[in-house]
Amino acid sequence: VEWSDSERKTLVSVWGKI
């Protein structure tokens, strides 16, 4: 599964909150 740059940034933000 390939994620776009924007989607990856969103994931990083969510993971950072955890």
Swiss-Prot record:
GO terms for molecular function: metal ion binding; oxygen carrier activity. Keywords: Heme, Iron, Metal-binding, Oxygen transport, Transport. Transmembrane segments: none annotated. Red blood cells. The keyword Transport applies. Belongs to the globin family. This fish has ten hemoglobins, 8 of which are anodal and 2 cathodal. The cathodal tetramers do not exhibit the Bohr effect, due to lack of the C-terminal His in the beta chains and to blocking of the alpha-amino group on the N-terminal residue of the alpha chains. The possession of both anodal and cathodal hemoglobins may be a physiological advantage for fish living in fast-moving water habitats. This fish possesses 6 types of hemoglobin chains, including a major alpha chain, a minor alpha chain, two major beta chains, and two minor beta chains. Heterotetramer of two alpha chains and two beta chains. Involved in oxygen transport from gills to the various peripheral tissues. This is Hemoglobin subunit beta-C.
